C-alpha cells in the first residue's frame, strides 16, 4: 500500500524507475565484466600456447627462401576427412597402421605443420617443396632413399601432380613390410603403376650385399640400421639366426638408370648419408637438381658440409640435429635437415 502511494508521486516514481535502470545497467556491467574476464583468460591461454610454440627448437632453421610461404602455397584447403585414414595438409591419405601412435587418427585431418607434425618440420617440408617448385614445368621426378611407407614419394608426388606436372617417384627400402605400406599408400593416393618404381634393397654408393634387421611386425621399428658390405661369415650367421634379411646393396647409379634428371633426391638411410653422397658425387652433380638429406649426427652434418664445399652447390636449408644433453653422453633425439641446390640444373 505504501509503495503504491509513493509511486503515485511523480518525483518518487522517477526515482524508483531510475533505481531500476541503474540495477539493470549494473547487472549488465557485471555480466560484461565476467565475459571480459573469460575472454582475457582465453587470450592468456592462447598467448601462452603461442609462446610455447615459438620456443620450439623446430624454428631453429636457416633458409635463403621463405619456407613458410613455400609451404602455404602448397597447402590444400577445404579437405574432407576419409573414413579410416588420416588426411594431411597436402591432401595425402595416410593409413594409421604404419605407426602405432596413429591408431586413433582415422577419419581426421592433420593440420598445417607449424612448426612440425608427427612426420616432419618446416625445414624438411619446405626444402622438399622447394625442389618441386624448381622442377621443369611439365614433370617431376624424385628418388627417396630409405623410403619407408613412401612418405616423401607420396607427399611430393601429390604436391607436384597438383601443379599439373607429370610425376615419377622412385623409392628404395630394406624392410619388405614397409615396402608393402608404400605400395598401398601410392595406390591409395592415385599413383598409377607407371608413375612409381620401388626397389627392395639397401641404397648405397656401390653394389654389394647388406644385412637388414628383421622385425616381426612392420611399422613398429623405424630407423633400423643395415650392415653394409656384409662378409660371407656375417651372411651365414644372419641366415642361421634369422635376425637379418640378406639384401642387395643397390647403387645410386642403378636407381637412376637412364634418367637424365632427378628433381629431388631425398636421403634418409640411418647414418650412411655422407658416404653415399661422397661416393656418388660425380653422378649427383651431373643428374641431381636438389638434395634433401636427413642427418643423423653432428659428424654427418660436418662431413656433408666438407664434401659439398668442394662443389658449386648451394645450401638453401639447414636445421641441425637435436641432442638431449641431460645424460652423461649426448643422445640424438631429432635428425637434422640439409637442403642443397645444384645451380647447374636448377633455376637461379
Role assignments for model-derived ranges:
Residues 1-27:
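N-terminal membrane insertion elements
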Residues 16, 23, 27-348:
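Phosphate/nucleotide-binding beta-alpha loop and adjacent structural elements of enzyme active sites
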Amino acid at each position: 500500500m505504501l509503495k503504491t502511494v509513493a509511486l503515485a508521486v511523480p518525483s518518487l516514481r522517477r526515482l524508483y524507475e531510475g533505481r531500476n535502470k541503474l540495477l539493470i545497467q549494473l547487472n549488465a556491467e557485471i555480466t560484461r565484466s565476467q565475459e571480459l574476464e573469460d575472454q582475457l583468460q582465453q587470450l592468456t591461454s592462447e598467448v601462452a600456447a603461442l609462446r610455447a610454440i615459438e620456443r620450439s627448437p623446430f624454428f631453429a632453421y636457416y633458409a635463403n627462401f621463405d619456407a613458410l610461404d613455400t609451404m602455404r602455397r602448397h597447402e590444400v584447403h577445404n579437405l574432407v576427412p576419409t573414413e579410416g585414414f588420416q588426411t594431411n595438409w597436402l591432401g595425402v591419405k595416410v593409413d594409421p597402421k604404419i605407426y602405432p601412435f596413429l591408431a586413433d587418427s582415422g577419419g581426421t585431418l592433420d593440420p598445417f605443420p607449424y612448426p612440425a607434425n608427427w612426420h616432419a618440420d618446416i625445414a624438411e617440408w619446405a626444402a622438399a617443396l622447394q625442389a618441386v617448385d624448381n622442377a621443369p614445368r611439365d614433370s617431376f621426378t624424385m628418388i627417396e632413399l630409405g623410403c619407408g611407407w613412401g612418405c616423401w614419394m607420396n607427399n611430393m608426388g601429390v604436391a607436384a601432380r597438383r601443379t599439373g606436372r607429370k610425376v615419377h617417384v622412385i623409392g628404395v627400402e630394406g624392410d619388405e613390410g614397409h615396402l608393402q605400406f608404400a605400395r598401398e599408400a601410392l595406390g591409395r593416393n592415385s599413383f598409377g603403376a607407371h608413375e612409381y618404381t620401388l626397389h627392395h634393397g639397401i641404397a648405397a654408393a656401390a653394389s654389394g650385399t647388406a644385412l637388414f634387421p628383421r622385425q616381426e611386425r612392420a611399422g613398429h621399428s623405424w630407423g633400423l640400421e643395415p650392415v653394409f658390405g656384409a662378409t660371407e661369415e656375417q651372411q651365414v650367421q644372419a641366415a642361421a639366426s634369422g635376425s637379418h634379411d640378406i639384401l642387395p646393396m643397390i647403387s645410386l647409379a642403378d636407381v637412376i638408370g637412364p634418367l637424365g634428371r632427378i628433381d629431388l633426391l631425398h636421403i634418409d638411410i640411418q647414418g650412411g648419408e655422407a658416404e653415399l653422397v661422397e661416393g656418388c658425387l660425380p653422378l649427383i652433380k651431373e643428374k641431381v637438381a636438389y638434395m634433401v638429406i636427413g642427418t643423423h649426427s653432428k659428424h654427418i652434418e660436418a662431413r656433408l658440409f666438407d664434401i659439398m664445399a668442394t662443389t658449386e652447390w648451394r645450401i638453401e636449408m639447414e636445421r641441425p640435429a637435436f641432442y638431449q644433453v641431460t645424460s652423461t653422453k649426448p643422445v640424438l633425439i631429432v635428425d637434422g635437415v640439409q637442403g642443397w641446390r645444384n645451380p647447374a640444373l636448377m633455376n637461379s
